[in-house]
Structure formats: structure tokens, C-alpha cells
Amino acid sequence: MPLTVNCPICKAPVEWVPQSAFKPFCSERCKLIDLGDWASEKHVIPVKAEFDPEAFDEFDLDKGDFFKE
């Protein structure tokens, strides 16, 4: 008996088998809806900022000349 999961978009049951071309989605439509949500940044992966804007003040750098070559 194959594992059954719900489509993340429409909640339809999807069998988790090699023949399920769009798993975990039930169809290409739901797969594309999810892709569009990622592209429009409705979904994001939270990350810690690598750069702290307040660090400029600590180093007494001129912000206007920072990116000039």
C-alpha cells in the first residue's frame, strides 16, 4: 500500500509512487502555482543577514565611497 500525501496547494490526495509525475503535487497546475508563489516571494526561506548595516558606524567608514573602485 503506497504512502498517500495531500497536495500542498489543493489538498487532493497524492500517492507517493514513482508514477506520480508531479509529487508532492497532484497536477502540473498545482506545481506551477507553487512555483509562482516562490517566484513572487510569497514563500521565503528565512536566513540571518550576513551584513549588519549598523557595522558601518563601528568602522567609521564613509557610506558614500564604500562601493566605489
Curated annotation (Swiss-Prot):
Which residue ranges traverse the bilayer?
A: none
Q: Which GO terms describe its molecular function?
A: DNA topoisomerase type II (double strand cut, ATP-hydrolyzing) inhibitor activity; zinc ion binding
Tell me the protein's name: DNA gyrase inhibitor YacG
Q: Which organism is it from?
A: Shewanella baltica (strain OS223)
Give the record's keywords alphabetically.
Metal-binding, Zinc
* Function per UniProt: Inhibits all the catalytic activities of DNA gyrase by preventing its interaction with DNA. Acts by binding directly to the C-terminal domain of GyrB, which probably disrupts DNA binding by the gyrase.
Q: Name one Pfam family in it.
A: YacG
Concerning its family, UniProt says: Belongs to the DNA gyrase inhibitor YacG family.
Co-factor note (free text): Binds 1 zinc ion.
- Identify the coding gene: yacG
Cofactor dependence: Zn(2+)
What GO terms describe the biological role, i.e. biological process, of this protein? regulation of DNA-templated transcription
Superkingdom, taxonomy of origin: Bacteria
Which InterPro entries does its entry note?
A: DNA_gyrase_inhibitor_YacG, Znf_NHR/GATA
Q: How does it assemble?
A: Interacts with GyrB.
Binding locations of Zn(2+)? 7, 10, 26, 30
